Amino acid sequence: MLKVSAPWLASLRDELNQTCFLAVWGNKGPTVVYVEASMGAVTLVTQIGSVLPLLGSSTGLVFDSFLNERETAALREQEMPLLSADQLRDVKLHIEQIRTTGVHQIQGLLMPGINAASSPLFAMGNKLVGVITVVGPGSVLNDETQNLAARRLLQTAQAISERMGGSRPSD
């Protein structure tokens, strides 16, 4: 998957001039395994080996939307008590939206001033194998540019998934 994804992420980074990364589901949750850093500021959340929150990051929410509940249950149970009732409602709405659109955009969820968009990668059997994310400062990745980034990210995720023989499962 990394070999297939890397050139696409480099191209997306060049087009958007924003940091792009690939995360896989590791034994502690969403884990960054590959980063194409932008020429601008590199954020702390985009280091290889970083483990991201399941319910508190765009990347994590995409994993939670498409992985089997048994795979995410332990981490979800760990994180849910840290969220308010409003935040838990938002998580549910985000998951419904992600399953429908195949992309998730968020502003400042994990770190204030840092915006992100994430999209799932599927392989044969339409199995979720990773999530790609574009991340950048809110001053640059604002509503208009974030929408463009999300569209290009979704197109890139679909192309990578097709290359691996998969596609987003339909409900």
Language-model features, listed with the residues they occupy:
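Cysteine/selenocysteine-centered motifs that mediate thiol-based redox chemistry or coordinate metal-sulfur cofactors
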Residues: 71-84, 88, 157-171
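Short, solvent-exposed cationic patches
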Residues: 54-60, 147-167
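Extended hydrophobic
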Residues: 84-157
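Residue-level marker for beta-strand->alpha-helix junctions and adjacent short loops that shape enzyme
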Residues: 27-29, 139, 167
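Short helix-to-loop capping/linker segments positioned immediately adjacent to catalytic or ligand/cofactor-binding
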Residues: 8-12, 20-21, 78-86, 101-108
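Amphipathic alpha-helical effector-binding/dimerization core
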Residues: 1-76
